[in-house]
Amino acid sequence: MSLATSTTPSALTRPLLPATAARPATHWIDHIWFAPLVLTVLCGSLFFYGLNIGQLYRTETLRAILGAEFLRNGDWIVPRLYGEPLFTKPPGMYAAIALASWPFGRVTEATARLPSAVAATITVLLFYWYFRRQTGKVGGLIAAVILPLNIMWLDKAPSAEIDMLQVAWVAAAIIFLLRALEADEEGHGGGIWWMAAVLCVAGGVLTKWTAPAFFYGTAIPLLWCRGRLRLLWGRQHLCSAAVGASICIGWAVLAVSRTGWEVFYNTVSREALMRLSPAHHDRPYPWVETLAHPLILFAANLPWSVCLFWALRPSFARLWDERGRRLLQALHCWIWPNLLFWSSIPEHATRHSFPLCAGMTGMAAMVWIAWLDGRLKWPVRWIRPISVLVGMAMFWVGLKLVFLHGVVPSRNDTREPREKAAQIAAAVPESATLYLFRLKDEGIMFYYGRPVRRLHGIEHLPSSGEPLYCILEKTEWEGYDQSRPAEAVLWLRDEQGSEIVLARFTDLQPHDDGS
């Protein structure tokens, strides 16, 4: 399918539909309040309602405990877990959680999930703005409404996870890139849009590292298709890239100055190589996962991924004017090059490819716009497409309510992190620091809510005239030689069901902890 198009300003400013084209709208859609009202209700019900329902689940607690550490120690540069630097992810999401929690003085379920809700809302509004600009008010509303109606968004928006914030950064960067190209083609420069796009890429780097892969995985094929690759070497892009890179490098320099080069480099390089390089992965190259990854992504983006089959037809591009074809071309460049890249690397977690879902949904929106305005034949005779779309939106709001009230509260029923944390808090003096060694249970530690520090062994416990409290795994406790008097205060099970023990150490001899 050829999507080559001319770039004359007159072609870009023609309306999407002729005046006589059929419209699925009634007069109330044209009211200035209608779209804001619909999007407010949609975002409020899908993203903000129920922020505080259910305890934090799995790695949500890791993000929250790191955000709480930002608030506690005032260091918003280096993520620290139990006092140790943790560079597996940059500080963006943790800083966002800390910022949302700062007015309340502590991190809660609601404040930990609030950044994802805000990011999801911004993404929906960006889709409405850009699709309205390209396809009209109805088209913008369709794109914004269907964007969050899929399985991935059901789980990730809202949550305390990083992924929704990364989707917002990537989607904003790509949309601003498209505006930069439009401005350049219309002779208006576009420098401010280049700067906005690259700053969003920098925000994505400081959230989850991967934003440049999505951005340039879209920009390079798109510029190549349009014969404008030279823009990557132009002053506007290079100056913007220099600013974005300076922000990221500046953070890295500050982080290294506080922790040392070895800690930073070893963690970041290990994370990158393990996910990108088959030679550094902990298993043989996963051919089956590589082949299955596109299918899994299509399943995660149901029901909208079904619409891609209509969009892939060569005749579909001919249904659109210049603006529509260029938007369709951009969405193709968003989806397929990135899908190829993220399917070929050895790490195939669906959440890493989450920004692709926005591109898929955008293309599905174009199919729905064509169905609704009559340019594409609706395949079902006995029901109108607008009725199906409204019904799906209402169904999804209902599904979200079921998920919030039926699934989320019960996810931690067997783990009981809050209850176990309360038992520990009752046994440990409020002024005491809790120590741990090999234990990895951020759920219990988050709800414990007091200072926790990790040491490399019992022998590194600091000297103190007061009892010291430590949590040990069962094997650690059973292998302890009682060289220092210790007693088990509390036995319980961690979130994975393994036995752990809260121990109290007394009569410690003065010991240099090497700090």
Label for each model-derived stretch:
Residues W33, N52-G54, A98, V388-A393, ...:
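Short low-complexity stretches enriched in small and charged residues
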Residues H511-S515:
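Short, solvent-exposed mixed-charge patches
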